[in-house]
Regions:
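Bacterial N-terminal signal peptides
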Residues: 12-21
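Short glycine/proline- and aromatic-enriched beta-strand/turn motifs that initiate or cap beta-hairpins
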Residues: 28-117, 281-287
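Residues on the lipid-exposed face of transmembrane beta-strands in outer-membrane beta-barrel proteins
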Residues: 57, 98-102, 153-157, 171-173, ...
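Transmembrane beta-barrel strands of outer-membrane/channel proteins
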Residues: 57-61, 112-116, 169-175, 206, ...
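Extracellular/periplasm-exposed beta-strand and loop segments of Gram-negative cell-envelope proteins
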Residues: 65-93, 116-148, 176-196, 225-229, ...
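Repeated loop/turn-to-beta-strand initiation elements of outer-membrane beta-barrel proteins
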Residues: 107-110, 163-165, 212-216, 247-251
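Transmembrane beta-barrel architecture of outer-membrane proteins
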Residues: 52, 93-97, 148-152, 197-201, ...
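Detector for outer-membrane/organellar transmembrane beta-barrel domains
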Residues: 166-168, 175-179, 187-224
């Protein structure tokens, strides 16, 4: 009898252990995974933070090349001059640049950008220059100023968005203001011109993540327009290698090329302005 009781007890113990193991296995099967988390569970951190706000501060070591011609009228052309060679303006400059990007959705971006190039020089010219309705003679000392200010508004939509690739089409407008001034103090000869031109842009930009830290970014915007009185074109391109310190802070080293050309046949401001600006770029981007 005792043997039978021990046998029954052993059978009960084995059955209880088996049921316990089945329960544990069943619970393990129902354990949530990262790809099937309940709504209340915290989601895993993304490969790159899905931010909604970016502030980018840049320094551009720009090489500058500027051709300019201000005509007295539509029938008479002025002198085409190179601002760096003929007027002595700086052909290189360290420029601060700022961009603010808003990301209202998973695939949308709105970017505000702007920069200013301000240069002045005092040089004795070696040729006759017709600038608007003034004539500057060889041997005269000319005080010149040439300023360019650019503001841009861009909208982008990501047509391809994966874990490592983000490719967007962009549309925007670049407002370019040009201010030119030339002064000969000995003859009290002075002329000043200002022009503002809005230029629409279309482009493409993208990012490829090599890993959690390193990425390659590139963008290009370009458009050429021909209106009744003004022809213009803008090219704004850049490429950069970036290093992500943490999900909120990125450092980058790249190259930027900016080229604006305006050919005006407007009766009030006829002439040509052609400026190329290119050089290495260092930037820091903060994300929130």
């Amino acid at each position: 009898v005792i043997s039978e009781r021990r046998h029954v007890a052993c059978q009960s113990l084995v059955l209880s252990l088996a049921l316990s193991l089945l329960g544990v296995a069943h619970a393990a099967d129902k354990k949530p995974t990262n790809d099937k988390l309940p709504d209340w569970a915290p989601k895993p951190k993304p490969h790159v933070i899905e931010d909604r706000f970016r502030l980018e501060v840049m320094t551009l070591s720009a090489n500058l090349d500027t051709d300019i011609r201000i005509d007295p009228n539509l029938a008479t052309q002025g002198t085409l001059i190179n601002a760096e060679d003929d007027l002595g303006l700086d052909d290189s400059k360290l420029l601060p640049l700022v961009e603010l990007t808003l990301l209202p959705g998973d695939r949308h971006l709105i970017r505000l950008s702007g920069f200013s190039v301000r240069r002045s020089a005092d040089q004795v010219i070696d040729k006759t220059i017709v600038f608007d309705d003034q004539t500057y003679l060889p041997g005269e000392r000319v005080n010149s100023t040439l300023n360019l200010t650019s503001f841009g508004l861009t909208y982008g939509y990501s047509v391809v968005k994966t874990q490592r690739i983000d490719l967007a089409l962009t549309f925007g407008v670049q407002i370019v203001e040009i201010e030119a001034n030339a002064l000969v103090r000995s003859r009290v000869v002075r002329d000043s011109e200002t022009g503002v031109t809005p230029l629409p842009l279309a482009g493409i930009e993208g990012r490829f993540d090599f890993n959690d830290r390193w990425s390659f970014e590139g963008r290009v915007q370009y458009l050429s327009v021909e209106l009744d009185e003004v022809d213009g074109s803008v090219l704004d391109a850049r490429a950069a290698l970036t290093w992500r310190m943490n999900p909120y802070l990125v450092f980058g080293l790249g190259y930027r090329d900016f080229h604006v050309k305006v050919d005006s046949r407007d009766i009030d401001d006829p002439g040509i302005f052609d400026m190329k600006m290119a050089g290495p770029l260092l930037f820091m981007r903060a994300s929130l």
